[in-house]
Curated annotation (Swiss-Prot):
It is found in: Cytoplasm. This is Chaperone protein HtpG. Residues 1-328 are annotated as: A. It comes from Rickettsia canadensis (strain McKiel). GO terms for molecular function: ATP binding; ATP hydrolysis activity; ATP-dependent protein folding chaperone; unfolded protein binding.
Amino acid sequence: MTQEKKKFDAEVGKILNLMIHSLYSNKEIFMRELISNASDACDKLRYLSQSNNTLVAGDSNFKITVKIDKNNGQIIIRDNGIGMNKEDLIENLGTIARSGTANFLKNLSGDSKKDNMLIGQFGVGFYSSFMVADKVTVTSRKAGEDKVYVWESDGLGEYIVSNSGKEFTRGTAIVLNIKKEEDNFLDHFRLKHIVKSYSDHIAVPIYFFDENGNSEIQLNSASALWTRPKLEITEEQYKEFYKSLSYTIDDPWITLHNKNEGAIEFTNLLFIPSSKTFDLFHPDRKRRVKLYIKRVFISDENIDLIPSYLRFLRGVVDSEDLPLNISRESLQHNSILDKIKNAITKRVLAELKKKKEESPEDYNKFWSNFGGALKEGLCESTTDHEKLLEVCIFRSALHNKMISLDEYIANFKEGQNTIYYLSGDNPDKLLSSPQIEGLLSKNIDVLLFTDTVDDFWVNVNSEYKGHAIKSATRSDIDVEQTTSSSEEKNTDSKKSDDEYKLLTDYFKETLGDLVKDVKISKKLTSSPACLAVSESAMDIRMERFLIEQKQIANASAKNLELNPKNKIIEKIFNDLKANNKNNKELVNLIFDQACILEGEPVADTGAFSKRLNDIVQKAILSL
């Protein structure tokens, strides 16, 4: 027998160290993980055997067995699935092979209490064995191959891989040498109860040996949960199935179990989590819904089964219409799959709309977890944008609560036809923004957009049900004439511009290229000034984001809007009428203040500081 001793990857070492020293109370999840792995191994071979039935020759009935050897203090889990060769053992058990495990590592904090909680939130798979075992031995023979390999480790930094000359049929056997302090897992009644609780949804039959190690007792019905009538499935069974798919400890918020009959036949069992999924904004944006064809697992990767913005869904879809021998490549552009995707999307959005209307508090929690992902769909050309906008909610500046666009429209002021919003990073800062003070003073609501994606989708969706969606930073907003005709607005605007031409010209002359234009504001009520952009220009926050991402080089010059009713602006105007043009420092300070309020950089921080100090000094001396 040839042996190779290898060191675990550093990342695996971190996980093993945590498993060995774990204080996590729910250690029984190691059985959930090992049973799930065994089931996956059977599913993989079942799929491969569709195109190569010699892989299951002589042993086509898949099963998993669990056995306790009390004399040796061992638990043995055996399957006749796809098995592993030497390379598979090294890759799967010696390195980080799962994105879920990699994400587990990223979330480690060094705080033993917090890190132990993570064990229950992430699927750490095979490595969870070391919570209860001080030695693990894996014997495996890959389907279609003759050689048998053994992997063994005490979890302390190294493992041994060797070839075995012993007779061993296809599949994998895992032997756990149970720690003395965890010997309660060697109790037949307890382990049987644990296995049963984690196996009822597994489509592979699971057998448990009796206390004498002889006769096998089947613990599960071995029928896919989603194929059973809903009335025969308990809430606990749904919950356990969800947890086996999601590797989380939360319960599902919504369960959607439907059988679709007609032109396209499929069954879906989908769950919306009650807690935010750890990989929601991972760069690869993976979707976690498994595709089955006639109860045979096909894939859960690289298939367009649900839109990316619904990637928080967990569950399975089982199709009756797709051929079992379909290639992974053919799934990329498949008309049947497209119809299934459209039907699921429609069903999920309808359920979300129902929940939004019936359980607003619960929906708010859902939205805080997954609203950012949902709004990504508004940027996709294939989305039914209106249906998606119907389930979106936003913070209302006027009412300080989350409301839908339909609720906003229902509360329009008489004659109002526009939905106003303001985007930024912090809702509290947005509430104090001069951009919306005039609108709020007239009881015209403003929606507060605080997700980065908001700045993108509003560029694609400029209206909703015939109502324009407009940023409060636009120059053409007139709070006094919100409900007036465009002709009245133009007349009043021209009158104001003519009346204050002396003032606006002075600001333009003083600020030069720092501003695109200077106008009299129709939306400010108390603040002296604010930055604004024209109807065709990019929103201020969107531009700032693109600069940060190096998509554009420099910020564009903005309009500066002045409030002639403000005492400071009024003083400058009166001085100008008296031919006093000695307020240039004050003009620059007003502009700098407007930039700061919008999160824009001040052109010259040194000059800004000097101006501020000079004005404060003058104020003190005048006391």
